[in-house]
Amino acid sequence: MSTITLDAPPPIETQVGGVDHFSSAAEREKQIALLPDERTLPLGPIKVVHAFWLAGMSCDGCSIAAVGATSPSVEDLIAGTIPGVPRVVLHHSVLSVESGEAFTHNYTMAEKGELGAPYVVIYEGSIADERIAAATGGYFSAMGAEKMPDGSSRPIPTATWLKRLAPGAAAVIAVGTCATWGGIPAAVGNPTGSMSIMDFLGKDYRSAYGLPVINVPGCSPVGDNFTETIACTLLFLNGHGPLPEFDELGRPQWLFDETVHQRCVRAGYYEEGTFAEAYGDKECLVEIGCWGPVVQCNITSRGAINHMGGCMNTGGVCIGCTMPGFPDRFSPFYKKPPGANISSAGSKVLGTFMRPLRKISMGYLNRETRWVKEGHVPSGWGHVENPGLVMGLIHKLYIKYQFLGSKKTWKAE
């Protein structure tokens, strides 16, 4: 396989997706300075990609969501069964068989540029300010240890691992809201100084393949959103597809361009101005604390696991967990959002007219033409009244308007 050194990147002729160059010249020089001179990137088809999973201030919920994915599954990625997608070698401190130095060996090899294959860094959880913990001789989030000059060992913060691995990574992917936006550990008043990966690496960060930080939010995220983003990114890195479309915050555009409300199974109730008054009601949940109309997330259409479940689908309200403002800007939870006072009031006014009109249409459409001619409905399940004089007149006007400008092939009695 031919190779190309990082200090002589090929010219980029056209803009691909949201990345129009590998990085700024100054940033590239800074990244190259962090890498050994012999560091190389493969050109041509990639057969294997290593995925180094790091965990910061997290609850491991993102790991659980990822292994629950089905479209594609983590097993598909590891086995290399997806056409065009290189086989993924996953290094995960919880899922791996190895432990101790045997586990961290490959991380060290990647840091030194001796891995012999491209790699991506996946970070779960927010990054705490380790200086705060170090002031008292501790640490917040660490993995592995390194020898000190005095012979002692010191834990290696995962933030340090990220700083070491990010410059040479083909891509850095933040999974979950803690990693993408800071999340709960970074909420106002936290004592850890936690921040997101994007905040930690900075605006000018670019991976070795020219990509800014990729963000797949959610607390926890939809597992399929994560694995699909991984697969699409690897297809691009392998030269089998264009760069996936990401929005201005690095989110997969095709997954986060619509709101929860636009695909919600309860959205029809909102349109008609009927709202739930208590949890367990079937109507729209906006008035009991749902932020769905202004939250970018696809869980109502994709479900939580295997296209099943999801907050609103199972009766829960949306608390905005995929958004950068979570949790502070959505607090207090389970309270009617301020904007709902206006939007739901408008829906109620419109619904006052829409609901009766739709019932009239349903009454018209719930009759066979034969039943209209014969004047009765032959149902043994209950008595169905014929429309009265006024309703009959409305139905005739409905039919006339329905076929306005069209040829009617049947006669209404």
Give, region by region, the residue ranges found by the protein language model.
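Iron-sulfur-associated redox domains of electron-transfer enzymes in respiratory
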Residues: 2-301, 307-311, 324-331, 400, ...
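Terminal low-complexity/disordered tails
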Residues: 312-314, 319-322, 332-413
